[in-house]
């Protein structure tokens, strides 16, 4: 049985591998999305993105969307603009439904950072969203796969 920890202490890594790629849940200062939770997605040294969560409203899924959809950060290659040279298009910033699962792959939506960390997080559209993001400074730096597995560091 894997060690457990609180959501705020857990690090999630891609199930398919991915080197230094990590996902960490954080508290949001601006709860305008209706949730006090978000996450930081680190894809490479000096390349990190903040996402906010929009909670589910009954039948709908919870959703993760880029919290700061302006220009993407500088990549290790030093590029700011998209490879095509186009300006970022409104509304195409990365987003995905987000699903949380326990050890038996039952839904396990956390209430806050002190809640037990779910074993797995599923972001089914995130990799594709990065591929089609017009402001992506480096399409080679994108999340791999959609399943993220908890690491409590024990």
Stretch-by-stretch model annotation:
Residues 75-104:
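N-terminal leader/propeptide segments of preproteins
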């Amino acid at each position: 049985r894997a060690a457990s920890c609180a959501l705020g202490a857990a690090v999630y890594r891609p199930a398919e591998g991915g080197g230094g790629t990590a996902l960490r849940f954080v508290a949001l200062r601006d709860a305008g999305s209706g949730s006090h939770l978000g996450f930081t997605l680190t894809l490479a040294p000096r390349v990190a993105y903040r996402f906010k969560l929009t909670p589910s409203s009954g039948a709908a899924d919870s959703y993760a969307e880029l919290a700061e959809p302006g220009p993407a950060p500088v990549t290790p290659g030093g590029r700011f603009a998209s490879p095509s040279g186009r300006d970022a298009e409104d509304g195409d910033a990365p987003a995905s439904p987000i699903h949380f699962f326990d050890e038996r792959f039952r839904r396990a939506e956390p209430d806050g950072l002190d809640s037990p960390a779910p074993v797995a997080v599923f972001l089914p559209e995130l990799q594709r969203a990065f591929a089609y993001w017009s402001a992506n400074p480096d399409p080679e730096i994108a999340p791999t796969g959609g399943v993220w597995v908890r690491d409590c560091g024990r």
